[in-house]
Amino acid sequence: MSKAAKKKSSKKRSGSEAAQFDQKTIQEFKEAFGIMDQNKDGIIDKSDLKDLYASMGQIAPDSQIDAMIKEASGPINFTVFLTLFGERLTGTDPEATIIGAFAMFDKKDCGKIKEDDLIKILQNKRGEPLDEDEVKAMYKGKPPIEGGEVDYKAFAHLITTGAQDELASA
C-alpha cells in the first residue's frame, strides 16, 4: 500500500475511536451521557439537549441544537456518543476543550462569562458539583476575574497548567 493510500485510509471513520479510552474514562463518559440523556431513554436527542441547557439556566437556539445533533451519523446512543468524543478528543488540547466548554456560556462571544455563571456551572447538581470548600480552593488559585467577569481562556490556561504568569507574557 502506498504512503498516500495509507494516509487516506487512516482518515476513515472506523468507530474505533472509543477504543482509545481506558475503563475509568469510559465510566466518566457514561456518567456524562446519563446527565445529558435527560429522559433516560438511552438516546440523546434535541429535547434532551434543550433540557440540559435549561437546567444550566441557558436557552440554546434550535439551530445550535440541530447542528449538534447533525454531527452524529444517526441516533446518539452511548456508542455513538463515545465515538463522537473519540473523534473530537484525538489530538485535542485539553485547554482548548475547556475553552470550548466555557464558550457555550459566553452569550456575548467576548471571551468572558459572568462570575456568577461560573459558580453556577461549577456547582450544578448534575455531574460532580463543587462544594463550598472546593470553590474557595479555586479562588486561592486566583482565577482571572475582573469586574465580575471571568476570562475563561485565561482560566482554562490556569486550570491546565497552573501557570498564571505565563499569560502575561503570551
UniProtKB/Swiss-Prot annotation:
Region annotated Disordered sits at: 1-22
Q: Does the keyword Metal-binding apply?
A: yes
Record-level Gene Ontology MF annotations: calcium ion binding; myosin heavy chain binding
Q: Which GO terms describe its biological process?
A: locomotion; muscle organ development; nematode larval development; regulation of muscle contraction
UniProt xrefs under SMART domains: EFh
**InterPro entries in the cross-refs:** EF-hand-dom_pair, EF_Hand_1_Ca_BS, EF_hand_dom, Myosin_RLC
Q: Where is the EF-hand domain?
A: 24-59, 93-128
Q: Which residues bind Ca(2+) per the record? A: 37, 39, 41, 48
Q: Which UniProt keywords apply?
A: Calcium, Metal-binding, Motor protein, Muscle protein, Myosin, Repeat
Enumerate composition-biased segments (Basic residues). 1-13
According to the record's subunit comment, the protein's assembly and interactions are: Myosin is a hexamer of 2 heavy chains and 4 light chains (two regulatory light chains and two essential light chains).
The miscellaneous remark of the record is: This chain binds calcium.
Name of this chain's protein: Myosin regulatory light chain 1
Q: Which gene encodes it?
A: mlc-1
